[in-house]
Amino acid sequence: MSVEERDRAESVVTRAPGAVPLLGHALTLWRDPLKFVQSLRGHGDVVRVDLGRLPVYVATTPELVHEITVTQARSFEKGRFFDRLRPLAGNGLANADGELHRRHRRMVQPMFSKERIHTYSHTMRRNAEAMADSWAPGTVVDIQQAMAEYAIETLADTMFSTEMGMPAVEAVRKNLPVLLKNLLIRAASPKFLDRLPIRANRDFDRAATQLRSVIDEVVAQARRDGQTDRSDLLTLLLAAQDEDSGQGLTDTEVRDELSTVMFAGAETTASALAWAFHELVARPDIEEQIVAEIRSVVGEGAVTIADVPRLTSIRRVLDEVLRLHGVTLLMRRTTVPVQLGRHRLPAGTEVAFSLYAMHRDPAVYENAASFDPDRWLPERRAAVARHAYIPFGAGNRKCIGDQFVWTEATIAVATVLQRWKLSPAPGHTPKEVASAVVHADRIPMTVSPRD
């Protein structure tokens, strides 16, 4: 984007207050990202935010977000946010553009089919039961940490199902939490801050290097091994072929897709589960309704994938926590001049939107800040504006693993509530922490056997 084009865009788009020299709004975003992204709606439908010296134009309404993600999706590529994540996830689905994205999506989509998720559900159930079995009556469990471990364990077991994959499983357990902790700030901050000799940078760089190195070795070893009779993601990716060209994925492409699944899947599931339990203990009426539903649908046996579509109360709770605690910020870049609402943006313009802010907009949702799962009852769901709820994105960039997350989270909620009653441990009120999605700092709870 030329200086002249940038000036024309700047002349018609309101700039958010609070920018400082060199850093722009990066410091404000770092200090309180959730408050900042929610404040932008009050400044217009499109608001300019400066990340360092880079202007970013933030769309704040469901209609404009739909323009970016669906109606004019082919006029956008992944933007700076994803450029900054490329050292972690390479050119996996989250980062790929154009024909590369379409090719990889065709090849990866079958791995999240209904039949595959049925297979993965056995791992989800087994890990949920192991988690519930590990708790002792009267002990305090950090639910945020427990759900993070469950989500990472399930992803790792789904990706690497043999002894050969154990080094990768251990690398995921050790390094993924370190990377997720600093993901948003790293992606949104000016690149020169990466070089500051501070512990956060050292830990991040070390974890990224270790994780990529171990997964590279496991992928190469699996390729040499040549076995194709397993159903883990690694084996499926190695065997995948493009239906048009007949070409498979290179080892680097396999590594990139595995990394993408890790970053996209672990934090979303863990956050949704932790917030679900947190919200339910404050609403015993809803918890009792869910427990009654579990007893009616599941009984005292194991929760299976056949039960998932019938556990409708759990689905409404998960919908509501994903609305309240969703994706913090996503970015795109225009590839051609784009008309976005009343604003003409030239090619090369960085554009962003916050699902977290959009899903909490009081102009869109009645009692937007309140936890109200019944807003997702069929008779009330119609009142939600079209395109206003997209927890997994929309259009050709919608997350292909959404059914994986719904299934995994439903099985976990039902398994835990079937066995345990949770109550808040005194002395701590959970606080929101902005990362790729909004998770809690800690949610300590006392667990007691359910009568």
Which ranges hold each PLM region?
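Cytochrome P450 heme-thiolate monooxygenase catalytic core
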Residues: 2-14, 77-84, 96, 100-102, ...
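Cytochrome P450 catalytic-core helices
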Residues: 268-287, 291-293, 403-419
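Conserved cytochrome P450 K-helix E-x-x-R motif and the immediately C-terminal K′/meander segment
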Residues: 23-44, 213, 301-341, 362
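Cytochrome P450 I-helix active-site segment
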Residues: 12-19, 121, 125, 173, ...
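Conserved cytochrome P450 K-helix/beta-meander segment immediately N-terminal to the heme-binding cysteine loop
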Residues: 353-380
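N-terminal membrane-proximal hinge/A-helix region immediately C-terminal to the signal-anchor transmembrane segment
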Residues: 1-103, 118-130, 166, 202, ...
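Cytochrome P450 proximal C-terminal region
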Residues: 2-6, 10, 128, 174-177, ...
